[in-house]
Amino acid sequence: MKNPLTLKIVFAVLCLLMLGLQLRSMSGWSESRGVFDDICYLRQAHLFQRFGLAGFDTDMSRDDDGYVRSKFREIGFPGWKDDKELPCHNTMAGTGKIVIQYPPGPGMVLALFPEGHQVVPLFWLSTIAVFAFACLAIFRARKPASIVVAGLFGVLAIYLMINPIKASYSMPPTAVICALCGYLTVRCFGVPEADRRFAPLVILGFVFGLSVDFRLANIFLCSGCSLFLLVDFLKSRHAQSFLRGAAFALALVAGMLPTLVSYWINTGSPLTSTYHGAPTVVPLDFTLSVVWEYLNDILQAALLALSIAGTVALWLARQGGLRRVGQLTAGNLVINLAFFLTYGIAVSYYTIPISLLSLWTSLFASVMQETETARAEAVTD
């Protein structure tokens, strides 16, 4: 197919077809699938809808309407009468409160929709956003091979919004954030130093901070950018490099404010996690059994392999911008894998965020480099 525009339209339509199939499948979902985490996320949303911003306080004393107890009773949980036995709730030593262990982000987003009809709109909007990013990559691509890669990855990214992202309500917003951060990372670090601007970097830091409000482990997603900014400052010792790093860090903290406020209210300190005392919190310890579990998960293993391949391709590229992004992405992968491979529990979606972030970053780096090259050639001509 010689006409790039025709090829772009073909793959955009393929992504649209996948989007339609996914939305149709999601439309039949139930909000009562008997998963403990689902109930806790929906309880946080219920608190925000009842109390507004006071919904940050998730103490079980606020369940005076019996919302969460009735949910656990409906699924046959034997300890539904005992607050201390409720899943994904922990007792905080500093306040004595029995609170939800998860960050408030999923509940805040779910609270935007009417009770009883919250999950499907969350997944619909997130999947539509991923489709939009896929189209952005497709139409930014210039070479036929890049258009094909962007289109195929777009179809895959939309497919992933059900399998395995359906496993947790924290994952749909995380998937969208990974796509946005992949784009912003290239805008911030894929250009020469003289062309770097503060605004995209501040936005990137803020969005990375927001990701922590959905999953605490998402804090590691910003490790590559943080490491790059630190090394850049240590090498140059320029005030400009310091200011860039400081702006990124401040924006990161600003994005995390909902989680910090939640911690402060529920634990008595913004630096004390509500996961304290949770049975799912285990010490870091490298074991081959965890590695084997991830390798046996074909989807996670395949996505990580693609992420590594894309990162290596960027690192070996001749263009300086691509190489910088490749180095940054490599650092990000190493730090994230170091954490998850030493965490004693392997779950079907734990490595999905770092894989998506790496793949979106690699994709946008490639297609945006083609755009810049085309512009430079046009100016030369």
Annotate each language-model stretch with its function.
Residues 36, 122-127, 149-188, 211-221, ...:
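Multi-pass, polyprenyl lipid-linked donor-dependent membrane glycosyltransferases
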Residues 155-156, 197-215, 226, 253-254, ...:
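Membrane-interface alpha helices of multi-pass inner-membrane proteins
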Residues 135-159, 176, 194-197, 323-327:
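Transmembrane-helix signature of polytopic, membrane-embedded enzymes
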Residues 50-105, 110-113:
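Interfacial juxtamembrane loops and adjacent helix segments
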Residues 127-137, 227-235, 299-336, 358-364:
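Hydrophobic, aromatic-rich transmembrane alpha-helices
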Residues 183, 187-191, 220-253, 281-282, ...:
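Perimembrane helix-loop-helix junctions
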Residues 24, 218-219, 231, 243-312:
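Membrane-lumen/periplasm interface segments of specific transmembrane helices
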Residues 119-144, 179-184, 315:
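Transmembrane-helix motifs of polytopic, lipid-linked glycan transferases
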